[in-house]
Amino acid sequence: MTQKEQGQGFIEVICGPMFAGKTESLIQRRNKALKLKKKILSFKPRIDDRYSVKEEIVSHNRNNIPAILIDKSKDILTFITPEINVVIIDESQFLDNDIIAIVDYLANCNIEVIISGLELDFCGKPFGPMPYLLAIADTVTKLTSICAISGGKANRTQRLIEGKPAQSNEPVVLVGGKEYHEPRCRKHHCLADIDKTKVNWKNFANQSK
């Protein structure tokens, strides 16, 4: 695909913990672009089936927009045509690392790329391709939620298994809503097997090498 003569591409990343309104913000940006008569494609990973298995992006408030379900990042390229102005991608943390090169390419083709996702997993570690997407983004919007314990600003996602904090060795991906997750601030975010008063070498072993 050749670069468009008009318009300027960019990458915007909307991130934050669960229940921060990331998908809602994504839907708002899509609707604004639609009013400007822009040609839009929306995508989400097929694995995200919390609220719908249909071809749509659904927020916690149950607002929705049409979307194409993808199994891998390269699937996006098969749908891109010269008239597309805007590409929207929800739940980007679930995608493979090819998404980094793909969104960079799309932005260089003068396409506006708007992405949402969790930048931290339930352990508080960088999640999937999100740290790289944040690094190459032209604009970053970091949203917060309300801590379920203190009522303060929450920037982390607490995983709960039968109402108790999860162990750090549990699978990173656990698709679900309030039955498994709640927003928490740094102070109240915890893991059952991690002592936060000590340097957390175990949790960040791969990142510190």
UniProtKB/Swiss-Prot annotation:
Report whether Nucleotide-binding shows up as a keyword of the record. Answer: yes
The alphabetized UniProt keywords are: ATP-binding, Cytoplasm, DNA synthesis, Kinase, Nucleotide-binding, Transferase
Q: Where does ATP bind?
A: G16, P17, M18, F19, A20, G21, K22, T23, D90, E91, S92, Q93
| Primary localization | cytoplasm
Q: Name one Pfam family in it.
A: TK
Name the reaction it catalyses: thymidine + ATP = dTMP + ADP + H(+)
Q: What EC number(s) does the entry state?
A: 2.7.1.21
Compartments, record wording: Cytoplasm
The GO terms describing molecular function are: ATP binding; thymidine kinase activity
Q: Which GO cellular component term is one of those annotated?
A: cytosol
The domain of life is Bacteria
Instruction: Please indicate if the UniProt record lists Transferase as a keyword.
Output: yes
Active-site residues, record numbering mapped to chain: E91
GO BP terms, alphabetized: DNA biosynthetic process; thymidine metabolic process
Q: Which InterPro entries does the record cross-reference, listed alphabetically?
A: P-loop_NTPase, Thymidine_kinase
**Subunit info?**
Homotetramer.
Tell me its family: Belongs to the thymidine kinase family.
Please give the name of this protein: Thymidine kinase
Organism of provenance:
Aster yellows witches'-broom phytoplasma (strain AYWB)
User: Mind giving the lineage of the organism this protein is from?
Assistant: Bacteria, Bacillati, Mycoplasmatota, Mollicutes, Acholeplasmatales
